[in-house]
UniProtKB/Swiss-Prot annotation:
Disulfide linkage: none
UniProt cross-references to NCBIfam families, sorted A to Z: L9
Native organism taxonomy: Bacteria, Pseudomonadati, Pseudomonadota, Alphaproteobacteria, Rhodobacterales
Pfam families for the chain: Ribosomal_L9_C, Ribosomal_L9_N
Record's protein name: Large ribosomal subunit protein bL9
Organism: Roseobacter denitrificans (strain ATCC 33942 / OCh 114)
Length: 211
């Protein structure tokens, strides 16, 4: 099926180009999204008449997208989720979650603009946001079980490193506990030995009685 593009479509073509696409792709995506028209003679003529207006509108929306991209690109957003000790999420982080995280931080992002396969592990994840057919930005989702964990991940530590540190800290606390118990036992033994080898000396009254 031939369509005429009303805007740039990635891997397909630029505005005004007539391209061949699968009928299902045209009917289910390009046409309802307003990205193309069927390439009939009437539609091609109508496009040529409106071309200048469409190009002006495209230029305006591209400038707006570029301004947003300049602020959005490189931003990091925290998403709190429950997960196992190995870092596997109980559920997933989706395009909706990414859009909501950006929106809560003050950016206008629609889930349809987010290019993302569901995230199923803790960690930092780069996510593409298509703000305009010719403009995109990359954000980072910091998926963690707590804000504290997110801050550690942001410093460059992986979930494996965090788990290893927690395990080492737990082992250290256990060792300290055993050391304290051992030290207390040694003190008790010393006190017992001292009591056994150092009997009380006779008082002056006892010496007078013997005399």
């Amino acid at each position: 099926m031939q369509v005429i593009l009303l805007e740039r479509v990635a891997k397909l073509g630029q505005m005004g180009e007539v391209v061949d696409v699968k009928p299902g792709y045209a009917r289910n995506f390009l046409l309802p999204q307003g990205k193309a028209l069927s390439a009939s003679k009437a539609n091609i003529e109508a496009f040529e008449q409106q071309k200048a207006q469409l190009e002006a509108r495209n230029l305006e929306t591209r400038k707006e997208a570029e301004a947003l991209a300049a602020k959005l690109d490189g931003q990091q957003f925290i998403v709190i989720r429950s997960a196992s000790d190995s870092g596997a999420l109980y559920g997933s982080v989706t395009t909706r979650d990414a859009a909501e995280a950006a929106t809560e931080a003050g950016f206008t992002v629609d889930r349809k603009q987010v290019v993302l396969s569901p995230i199923k592990e803790l960690g930092l994840h780069a996510v593409q946001v298509v703000l305009h057919p010719e403009v995109d930005a990359t954000i980072h989702l910091n998926v963690a079980r707590s804000v504290e964990e997110a801050e550690l991940q942001a410093s460059g530590k992986s979930i494996q490193e965090l788990a290893a540190e927690e395990e080492a800290a737990a082992e250290f606390e256990i060792q300290e506990l055993f050391d304290d118990i051992g030290a207390a036992a040694s003190e008790d033994e010393e006190l017992a030995e001292t009591a056994g080898v150092a009997p009380a000396e006779p008082s002056e009254e006892d010496d007078s009685a013997k005399a």
